[in-house]
């Protein structure tokens, strides 16, 4: 089987197999020959005895080192609800008696293809694991169809000895352990593959049946003198225009295609602070709010999240990307489309609001760009309130589960849209997205674009923000269906916090450092020795006076950064007997100003302090504080510091 099956193992943060010891028992949700074989193979590859060999330590002799929380019985049509609770209780009693001193329980979840369930699916009924025979048939086809995409998740180990210290008797301790792990598995499944998803048709029907959309349809009939059937069909058309058509098969194929694309385009993807995301992924509604630098952003975050064992987000994309051929693929990858403005279309607004609200209530991870469009300068754009306002209002009306915003920073060393941005900044009109433009853009596949950086910011809990702004918001929302006016203030504050959160996890890469130094020199040229000194100064400032704990910086030395810039085709060298001169061509200077602007906020305060001493060697502390207090608020507002 393992000539065909390919597994990827993801362990919980801090998981150290060397510290597990010899007395280890794995916990799985349900039995299955293929799952047990995968676990055995993983243990053998990790130089551990396979669980099927049993658990044999002083005081314990079990035929298997696996506890199943739900076991299949021998009924023909239905699986029994029996479990391995007696085995778990024997283990707990043995530890309680001191032989062995402790047993470590390791929850293990194995996913074949990671396909979310679909409500109302005939295929789900036919292949449901609630039917013993069908369950085996389903697993056979899963091995054949999804054997190349198997994810093994090892959760944080649980000490039986520590659980016994709570003072419960062995029977109750075993039951509590089983219940806690069972809840963990359910949450982990949702985090990994996403919640149950409706068919697109079912989702559209839910939207049209909702009171808010029904009221909007009636208003449409009155205002535009339509027949009720016409207004309803118009609403249905809007819903189909908006809704994603999520396909796990497209996600799996996209992962393979994108892996090869990234290998062709980039020299690696650096991921920072992923632990922050994993810490809040379980049990929360996640809304990813990244900065918007490139069209690659749409693909990059989904790829990074999926590769690290989390469910792909549904992404809000502009209707301009709903192109022939491309649009359906994006839609099946989780994209849902929105018009640039729908303030004057109440029916469309009602349909879109309900679609977003239903997805948030189901726990579907969402991604959208609060800047509204891609930055052409490299600096963050002010937050647009539209999607944030809809999200906050939806949560206030129906807080089904905690909602957490996760800021995400994207850093590039070269953009595939660089030339088009250059044209736009030169005054040319923005080129509209089209299929022909997409085909012409494929020429970038011949180029290299350096490294990509994806950093996750500190999560922002919406409920906490609402509690600060309006302590009685829950009671007010329950008592009235009106849109509370105070929400707009929360939305403005939230937008500012998200942008500040993005900047707080910026990635200072070699291109950004070189651009920062060279663009501040006359004629974009400098002696190599001076360039080395200036890069070392910037690195020392970033390390010695850090902007924040989330900022990541290149680990290359100043010399290596210059070498990198030359190999990357960014720097030019002119030899001279008094010392080589390093310079930027004019065209390169315009392009790399984008990457200097990515990190301008990091050097803003040191630069302000340096400017205060520009024409004097000394300055009283009071005068320095006065200068900073007058200028800094403008910098903070402009650069989202």
Regions found by a protein language model. Give the residues of each.
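Membrane-interfacial terminal anchoring regions of lipid-handling membrane enzymes
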Residues: 1-641
């Amino acid at each position: 089987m393992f000539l065909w099956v390919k597994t990827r193992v993801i362990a919980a943060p801090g998981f150290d197999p060397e510290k597990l010891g010899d007395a280890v028992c794995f916990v799985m949700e349900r039995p299955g020959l293929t799952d047990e074989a995968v676990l055995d193979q993983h243990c053998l590859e990790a130089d551990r005895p396979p669980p099927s060999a049993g658990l044999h330590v002083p005081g314990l002799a079990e035929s298997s080192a696996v506890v199943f929380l739900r076991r299949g019985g021998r009924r023909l049509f239905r699986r029994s609800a029996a479990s391995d609770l007696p085995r778990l209780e024997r283990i707990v009693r043995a530890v309680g008696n001191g032989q062995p001193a402790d047993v470590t329980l390791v929850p293990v979840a194995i996913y074949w293809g990671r396909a979310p369930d679909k409500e109302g699916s005939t295929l789900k009924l036919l292949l449901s694991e609630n039917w013993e025979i069908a369950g085996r048939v389903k697993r056979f086809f899963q091995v054949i169809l999804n054997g190349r995409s198997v994810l093994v998740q090892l959760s944080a180990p649980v000490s039986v000895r520590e659980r016994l210290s709570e003072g419960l008797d062995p029977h109750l301790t075993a039951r509590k352990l089983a219940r806690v792990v069972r809840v963990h598995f359910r949450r982990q499944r949702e985090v990994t593959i996403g919640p149950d998803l409706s068919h697109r048709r079912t989702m559209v029907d839910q939207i049209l049946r909702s009171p808010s959309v029904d009221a909007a349809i009636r208003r449409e009939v009155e205002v535009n003198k339509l027949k009720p059937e016409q207004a309803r069909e118009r609403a249905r058309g809007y819903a189909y225009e908006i809704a994603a058509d999520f396909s796990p098969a497209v996600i799996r194929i996209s992962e393979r295609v994108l892996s090869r694309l990234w290998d062709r385009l980039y020299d690696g993807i650096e991921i920072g602070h992923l632990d922050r995301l994993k810490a809040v992924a379980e049990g929360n509604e996640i809304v990813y709010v990244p900065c918007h630098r490139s069209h690659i952003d749409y693909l990059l975050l989904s790829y990074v999240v999926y590769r690290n064992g989390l469910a792909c987000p549904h992404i809000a994309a502009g209707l301009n990307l709903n192109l022939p051929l491309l649009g359906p693929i994006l839609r099946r990858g989780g994209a849902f489309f929105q018009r640039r403005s729908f303030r004057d279309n109440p029916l469309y607004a009602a349909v879109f609001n309900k679609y977003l609200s239903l997805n948030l209530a189901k726990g579907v991870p969402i991604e959208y760009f609060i800047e509204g469009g891609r930055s052409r300068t490299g600096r963050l754009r002010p937050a647009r309130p539209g999607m944030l306002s809809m999200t906050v209002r939806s949560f206030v009306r129906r807080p089904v589960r905690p909602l957490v915003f996760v800021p995400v920073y994207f850093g590039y060393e070269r953009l595939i849209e660089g030339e088009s941005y250059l044209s736009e900044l030169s005054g040319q009109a923005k080129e509209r997205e089209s299929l022909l433009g997409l085909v012409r853009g494929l020429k970038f596949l011949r180029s290299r674009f350096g490294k990509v950086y994806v950093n996750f910011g500190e999560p922002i809990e919406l409920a906490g923000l609402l509690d600060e702004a309006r302590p009685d918001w829950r009671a007010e929302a329950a008592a009235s269906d009106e849109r509370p006016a105070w929400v707009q203030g929360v939305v403005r504050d939230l937008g500012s916090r998200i942008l500040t959160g993005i900047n707080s996890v910026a990635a200072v890469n070699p291109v950004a450092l070189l651009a920062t130094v060279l663009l501040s020199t006359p004629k974009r040229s400098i002696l190599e020795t001076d360039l080395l000194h200036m890069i070392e100064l910037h690195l020392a400032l970033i390390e010695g006076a850090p902007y924040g704990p989330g900022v990541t910086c290149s680990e290359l030395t100043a010399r290596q950064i210059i070498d990198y810039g030359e190999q990357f085709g960014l720097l030019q060298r002119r030899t001279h007997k008094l010392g080589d001169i390093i310079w930027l061509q004019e065209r390169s200077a315009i392009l790399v100003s984008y990457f200097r602007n990515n990190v301008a906020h990091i050097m803003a305060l040191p630069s302000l302090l340096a400017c205060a001493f520009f024409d004097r060697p000394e300055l009283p502390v009071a005068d320095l504080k006065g200068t900073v207090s007058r200028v800094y608020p403008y910098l903070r507002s402009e650069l989202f510091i």
